[in-house]
Amino acid sequence: LGGTYIDMMSGEFMINPLEPKAWSENSRFGNQENETDDSPETFRKVTRLSQHISYLKDFFRAYKDFTDAEIDTIEIMLMKLYARFGIDDLTDLDKLENCDYPVMSDLYELVEKEFMAFDNAKKHLYTEGILQNICLGLHSMCKGAESKYFNGRTNIKDGEFICFGVKGLMDTNKRLKDTLLFNILSYMSDQL
């Protein structure tokens, strides 16, 4: 059939969780308002980046039992990280290449740097303990044993037919399985 078989447990193929996906037709075409939607204007101004960060909050919750405060802090760190890469709500993501996006180790290094430089004398929206918990919770995914599934640039070539091999996922822990499936489904949604 001329398709490609991708064994996601091999670590050979990567879907970068931090590469924003298009979650709707409107977000696929940038920062457009849905004129037929009768919801408040604020809710109609959805960007691809803001939708993706909302997805990432669920993605990280699937991976670990993060508290609401930890998820909110991860969101702040993601905004800082994307800003460091010159990415914001006004960025035309269709003009960016895979190499233009941060990877998971970039997120970890940012959170770790914030943790190491934390100054209790200053006011913060988050605590030193929250940063420490995030570092501990993300370490395996970003730098440790499970980083081979999440830390890298998307390297799946576009093809007419892609078959994702997920059989090996059944032999892994529930959180890793759920997070990998979540990542695969986000990629598939973006390709439609």
Predicted regions and their residues:
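P-loop NTPase motor domains
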Residues: 1-10, 18-192
